[in-house]
Amino acid sequence: MLNEPLPSSMEDNPQFKEETSLQKFRRRLKEEPLIPLGCAATCYALYRAYRSMKAGDSVEMNKMFRARIYAQFFTLVAVVAGGMYYKTERQQRREFEKMVEQRKAQEKRDAWLRELEIRDKEDKDWRERHAAIEAAAKEAGKRPAPKKLPEQDAARSAIEPADERSIGVLSAVRDLWMQQK
């Protein structure tokens, strides 16, 4: 339940799906086909004007420059008309993109918080284990030493204090483990 995204009114609408740049280009080309047509007409007029200039035909060159201006005007009108026609759809798309961005930011934030919680839990568990080990070590250190017999004292006097076996951390943990069972 926690991993599922919240339902959205735009979720089932195929018009508002995330799209790649190529898909966006194709969609815009289908929505406003007059703009690329005007750009192509402008480029063709410039090409013809260039060819006329190379040929030395100034009359044809002037006609093509005028045609270029008309083609640019047509392109500009197509841009303005398309902008007015698709204004509401673009606003909806911007709102959808904002929602997608907010959802991604929220998912990133939630993942970060989950990771922090996991780290905090691991740290808390480690501290508890460390405290238990410390307590077991202190308890093992407080145990009274076994009473020595006089014969053992003579034999032990040859053993240096550094060679004596002391209770280590592993023994303390083992003792703690046995007490819990």
From Swiss-Prot:
Gene Ontology process terms (BP): mitochondrial respirasome assembly
Species of the source: Aspergillus fumigatus (strain ATCC MYA-4609 / CBS 101355 / FGSC A1100 / Af293)
Ranges of Basic and acidic residues composition bias in the record: 134-154
Summary of subunit composition and partner proteins: Associates with the respiratory chain complex III/complex IV supercomplex.
Membrane-spanning segments: 33-49, 69-86
GO cellular component: mitochondrial membrane; mitochondrion
Location(s), subcellular: Mitochondrion membrane
Record domain HIG1: where: 6-97
Lineage: Eukaryota, Fungi, Dikarya, Ascomycota, Pezizomycotina
Membrane protein topology class: Multi-pass membrane protein
Family stated for the protein in its record: Belongs to the RCF1 family.
Alphabetical list of InterPro entries matching this protein: Hypoxia_induced_domain, RCF1
Positions of the UniProt region annotated as Disordered: 134-161
Pfam families xref list: HIG_1_N
Name of the protein in its database record: Respiratory supercomplex factor 1, mitochondrial
Keywords in alphabetical order: Membrane, Mitochondrion, Transmembrane, Transmembrane helix
Superkingdom per UniProt: Eukaryota
Functional note: Cytochrome c oxidase subunit which plays a role in assembly of respiratory supercomplexes.
